[in-house]
Amino acid sequence: ISPFFQKSLWKWWYQRLAKAHGRADFRFMNYGYKDGKELKLLKEDEPNRLFIQLYNMNIRDVDLKGKEVVEVGCGRGGGASWIAKTYNPKRLTAFDFSKDAIGLASNWYSSQKNLSFKVGNAEDLPLKDNSKDIIYNVESSHCYGNVEVFVKEVYRSLKAGGNFCWTDFRDKESIEKLHEIFLKTGFEIVSKKEITTEVLDALDDINDTKVKGINESVP
């Protein structure tokens, strides 16, 4: 399918999901991560442990405290909220192309002063050049019509020496192409890890409620 059609299809899917599922307990849209190491969490975050652990795995090697941070593809905001309160960035701005998801997240997390949610296009980020310390992206880029444009937008927006933390699902051929895009754009890959086993282990533990909710909301 064409990049435009692919992007439009994913946008429709996520918009429909956000509209149909305004439940406050359905705040994460990622698969989860389980590596046998128990991340220390507040009691209030325990129900979302596996989803939070994927976010933590993605950003745990960088220092976010006092930094200008961006999440691209934040969904319903659960991950951004947890990172903002746990790692204390100066400001975390979270973008998503679903205005309904952004509306939910903005309402749910309005009390977090270092966190904001905005509608935004990953392939045309509303950010100034060289303005952010860290940009991260969790299981979202497979929806984009042109991933190379997205990577270039991230590179443009990062300060010199900034970090891009990325995780998503890809087959062997497409991940090799993506690595080439990173390098061609100007990034240095300082660490990488395949986490298929850890994600599958998390999926085995995730309650069927999440899958049921998606199936009820999206035909």
Regions found by a protein language model. Give the residues of each.
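A short acidic, Gly/Pro-enriched loop at the edge of an enzyme's catalytic core
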Residues: 123-135
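Class I SAM-dependent methyltransferase Rossmann-like catalytic core
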Residues: 34-52
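Class I SAM-dependent methyltransferase SAM/SAH-binding core
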Residues: 70-72, 76-124
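Conserved alpha-helix/loop element of class I SAM-dependent methyltransferases that forms part
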Residues: 48-65
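A short glycine-rich, Lys/Arg-flanked "PGG" loop and its adjoining helix->strand segment in the class I
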Residues: 148-160
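N-terminal auxiliary segments of SAM/dcSAM-dependent transferases
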Residues: 1-26
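Substrate-binding/catalytic lobe of Class I Rossmann-like enzymes that use SAM or dcSAM, i.e.
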Residues: 176-219
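Conserved beta-strand signature within the Rossmann-like core of class I S-adenosyl-L-methionine
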Residues: 161-168
